[in-house]
């Protein structure tokens, strides 16, 4: 099970649940019936009658078989050189030039760089007159901004969800440094704080509070509220609680917003214990000040619970919201948080239940569809459902479809379902203009698609997108693509010729249907794309993209190419010192992040210090390279291994031994301890590495070595039959008695370990740490 999580992090096998054990978020939820929950969360809200509902489980589809063929290195190198030749000529004629910094940061469509606000023709005073600034503050701000080519970004409710760009932060620093507050009153200070974007406000609050103290003016409830909001956004729980105590000491009555700020600070820090204590205080505040919790209070508490992986608690609070009162009915944001949590736990059935509730209440929005699509992508049997929801999203919310978040979801759907042809076509379209150039997230997903793509005989029929859209367009892939993202798709074929400095060297194709990928094309194109981005757009290649690039070499069974990539994207612990950036400094962008990305345009691609992510892929590559394709297998043999030359066997065995030694050294480093902070995490990581080295040695027919490692593993390793199935099959095929004996012993020991867990008083076996070598 642990191995499956590492090899396929986004797609788990479909689990068949019994209806009597499934959880439904319909009105008959068991959470509403829990007296313990009602007493824990109880406020003076009326009860609501209950109804019961059930849901239907879909049946999983059978996966198609993969058609694998071995590829020669000469063919790959030849194709790679042909792909890169046009770009080398373009560089020689200086057709490829870097964009100016201002244009590099400009967003549109898929690009997530944050751009300067276009200069308005209105005067600064006209612009500031519409803000919440008092006239006295507006005049000083206008004076400070005189001559500036860009306008100052002012806080709005919508801007709370957008990251303030660095240059706007500098502008605000300039404005604050030039203010003369000698005549400021409390309304002036309040308007100033309200106007500063909330995500950068905390850094200016000490100066503003000092000005208030020097002026000797008395802070109001609004003053404390804006100060607490700024510190809460920064996750500074101590500062927020200190200001709350000052409010009480100054006899200023707190409001529901005051408690919302306190909970928000806990949410930003992920402090669930403190949040629950504040929630208990809120119950007392209801009696003292007549404060009743609103949607924001409950939604923030749900968010904090989810940050701490307390999905059960979040669900209980959610159910209580629905039945407490009309004022506390869950919002779209609340539903979306629960759908996202269900996606993380691969509980797609519950996510679909929540979606049906939202449709009944007409509160489903674009974010709902995005979260639900990601939930469907976590289970293979719902992949087609994900594409159907994507079509529905485009029809229901066409005005909001072309956004960064939706584009990331489209790329994720294509990457997870292995629709490389569709994904690379979209990526190429985005490269047509600097306004829409792909970001690091989309580059990650492109590399993931190369790693996940199955070389099948009929890729069009195997595509989840075409299987779904074929019903609408009669299987015409060209018609499906036309206008999906941009209306001017007809010129896609000539992009390499028209934009040689911007378009990566994709394989040419006349139509989408004409491109059929095999291993040679996948390896050559992914290598060419990576080299192009490495030389021209290194800021788009983070650690995740490099890892997926490495997986593509391992997945498509070209061991020499994999070794080249392994040394290109990673270095050993000894080589890393002074040569590459430290792991803490490495940039890794997440598709789940809500705020736009900021890139250092001066960055260069650097190989990462090796860790378990690299070691696991390396051993998987050895095992995959030893397994024969269906066309290569000898029908007279009862094992799946292909015949290797003595030199190939030696090379792969030496590489596996090098990985073993290097991982042992890394295990003693601080990087290992920082990555796995608990004993359970360390045991899990060591277990997975032991399993992979055993399978690699078994694939190399080194059954005695594999059996020796298995026998030396600690007693804390809970070996299961399905984990050792590959080793068992090979050992059985070669009649290796010692290996069979050790497998039986390890599995029996695990059964004894299960008994020890159930009965702590039973005898515990001694432990020997094989990884201390």
UniProtKB/Swiss-Prot annotation:
Region Disordered: list its residue ranges: 89-122
Give start-end positions of Basic and acidic residues composition bias: 89-106
GO annotation, cellular component aspect? cytoplasm; mitochondrion
PPR repeats, residue ranges:
220-254, 255-285, 294-328, 331-365, 366-400
Keywords, comma-separated and alphabetical: Mitochondrion, mRNA processing, mRNA splicing, Repeat, Transit peptide
Q: Name one Pfam family in it.
A: PPR
Highest rank taxon of the organism = Eukaryota
InterPro entries in alphabetical order: Pentatricopeptide_rpt (IPR002885), PROP1-like_PPR_dom (IPR033443), TPR-like_helical_dom_sf (IPR011990)
- Transit peptide located at 1-23
Query: Tell me, what is an example of a GO biological process annotation in this record?
Result: mRNA processing
UniProt key word Mitochondrion: yes
Instruction: Recall the GO molecular function terms of this protein's record.
Output: mRNA binding
Residue ranges annotated as coiled coil are none
Gene3D superfamilies named in the record? Tetratricopeptide repeat domain (1.25.40.10)
Is the keyword Electron transport assigned to this protein?
Answer: no
Localization terms from the record = Mitochondrion
Q: What is the role of the protein in this entry?
A: Regulates mitochondrial small subunit maturation by controlling 15S rRNA 5'-end processing. Localizes to the 5' precursor of the 15S rRNA in a position that is subsequently occupied by mS47 in the mature yeast mtSSU. Uses structure and sequence-specific RNA recognition, binding to a single-stranded region of the precursor and specifically recognizing bases -6 to -1. The exchange of Ccm1 for mS47 is coupled to the irreversible removal of precursor rRNA that is accompanied by conformational changes of the mitoribosomal proteins uS5m and mS26.
Similarity comment: Belongs to the CCM1 family.
NCBIfam families in alphabetical order: PPR
Q: How does it assemble?
A: Binds to mitochondrial small subunit 15S rRNA.
Q: What else is known?
A: Involved in mitochondrial-nuclear incompatibility, a major determinant in reproductive isolation between species, through hybrid incompatibility of Ccm1 and its interacting partner 15S rRNA between yeast species.
Protein name, please?
A: Mitochondrial 15S rRNA processing factor CCM1
State the organism of origin: Yarrowia lipolytica (strain CLIB 122 / E 150)
* Gene label: CCM1
